[in-house]
Amino acid sequence: MVGATGRQIREIAMSTALRIAHGAFGRVALLDMDWSLVRHAHPHCHVLLKVEGADTQFVVGDTVYPLTCDTAVLVNGWQPHSYVHDPDKPRTVILALYIEPEWLMAFRPGWAASGAPGFFSHPSGDVSPRIRGLAMNLAADMMAHPDARNAHESALSDLMIAVIERFAPWRSFPASIREMNARSGDWRIRRVVATMRAETRPGAVLDTFAKQAGLSRAHFFRLFESSIGVPPKVYLNVVRMEQAVDAMLNQSASVCDISNQLGFTEPAHFTRFFRNHAGVGPREFRKVSRLAS
């Protein structure tokens, strides 16, 4: 199965999104990457595994971590990170997992903490032969059978269990859940977050949110980041990106109409925003994701 993946990838070397699977588990993207991504975050348990191509790297927090056949990159929920592509190197095929904490909770209740800071104790870890094999088999099956959703979810279950049991201190997760509750406990920040989640205008003024919280701009920024884990601007971009992904997966509206819904002044601005965060444009994202339908 692994060899089939390599042949098919080489046949469509111009693609940037090879496959995208989606469901209750979240998203799994098989990406052929040749450019960097802006600093961003996700509300998911985020795991990055190299499939083939050049070794590469991600910045997690403020530190660079390698992504190779032997090392995975592990990103906690709301942890800022970016992809750093070396233009002098060949492309890299990456299996990117964006996993919903609610789905993981079905395996162990404590795994609800997978969307919280501190779930993975370190952003990098050595890939075991089992994890490598499971990742390659999932990538191969997504390439060969893009619409086999049940098989993909089953393979993903095995992979995520292996990843979490190897890289996360799962026996301490009840404490992580209490910590997660404490970190988001300030009622002023919760109220602002609710407003932000209803906000779609790219030009939202952060001073307005500080005023709503009854805080100075500096105090608001400090309290927001200590409560949520990311600065307000990054959080707004996360919300807008998740709205965009949901629209591309679940709406039949045109990219232009979705761009207008989300408050972008030009479809080109929306496309650039989407590509800078996801690695592919919205049209390609929708086209490839429909292979899994």
Question: What residues fall within each predicted segment?
Answer:
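Short hydrophobic/aromatic patch on the recognition helix
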Residues: 70, 219-224, 269-270, 274
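Terminal helix-turn-helix DNA-binding modules in bacterial transcription factors
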Residues: 194-210, 215, 225-267, 271, ...
